[in-house]
Structures are given as structure tokens and as C-alpha cells.
Amino acid sequence: YNMFEALATLAYDGPRQDFARRELLAALKMEQEEGLTPSQMTSSWAGAFGHTQFEPTSFASHAVDGDGDGKRDLWHSPADALASAAVLLSNAGWTKGAPCYVEVTLPAGFAYEQADTDTTKPVSDWKALGVKRPNGLDLPASAGSGAIYLPAGARGPAFMAFDNFRTVLKYNKAAS
């Protein structure tokens, strides 16, 4: 999609008009500052673009030249896209070396209403409830607290999500 057409459509008629207007203005600024043409600025139907699906306002705040060619090109340079995503995650609170999530097994009789990324408990509390790692390794107590995440529902795999997982959700709210 043409980024300007996508964002203008959403700014005119959509549930998030104010958001789309901000993104459209940021896209116009990006076009001017980066020396791009509208035909170069392709996006999803919602205006996200490049290898890592940045939004124009995120580009303005977090995009970097990861390959040293003097440009911030998230469409064609994986190095620029990944370095920019790393900057965005770092600025959003990513803790280097801390886990994002680990797979866990839940005990029989687990109260599934506790499985919600907003319901956090100290790792020691989850352990006391019988939550453990399937591989026999210890739960990462250094992570402090975690939440049980069931991306495929109660019959699918279970994960314990930590602060870095919530940081990823700031980047992209789709947890599936």
C-alpha cells in the first residue's frame, strides 16, 4: 500500500482517526527529512512499514543507521531495521540479559483465571502453586515477577512472561 493513502484513509474514516493523523503528519515529515518519494514509502494497510513494521512516529524517535551508509532505511536494510527495533525496545524498557518468557507446565487443577499477562506474581509464588519448567530447569527467580501466558488457550503451551515480554507488547500489542 502507499503509506500516505493508507494513513489518509484511516485519518478520514476509522476508529483511530487521531492516531492516523499523527502518523500521517510524521510520514510527511519523514518523506521530507529522509528525501523519500511517496512511491518508496510502502506500508501495510495500517501504515506500518519496513522489515520490523515501524510506525512513522516510531521512526522519528527510534530509527538509526545500522549499516553505516548514512541512511535510515527500514524497507531495504535489515541492519537498519534490526538496530532501530533494538533502540525502540531499549527505550521502552528492555532489560539486557533478562528473560522475555520461558515455557512452563501448569499443575493439575490450575486456576486458569490467573492466566493473564496483567496478573503478575513473584516467581516464588508461581513455583509454590506448582508451576515449573518442562525441562526440569529452575524458574528464573532473578526475573522477579511473571505472568502466565496461554497464547493458544488452556490446551496449548503455557509460558511465564516477564517484564521484557511486556516491553515487546509496547512495540506491538499483538501477543499471538
List each model region and its residues:
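Short, functionally critical alpha-helical segments immediately adjacent to catalytic or ligand/cofactor-binding
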Residues: Y1, A27-Q32, A85-A86
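Solvent-exposed, acidic/flexible segments
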Residues: Y1, D13-L24, A48, T52, ...
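Acidic, His- and aromatic-enriched active-site or binding-groove loops in soluble protein domains
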Residues: E5-E31, D65-D67
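Short secondary-structure junctions and interdomain/linker hinges
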Residues: G14-Q17, E34-P38, A92-K96, R133, ...
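Short, hydrophobic/amphipathic alpha-helical patches that form generic packing surfaces
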Residues: A8-L10, V87, R166-K170, S176
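Flexible, glycine-rich surface segments
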Residues: P38, W45-F49, E55-G156, F162-F165
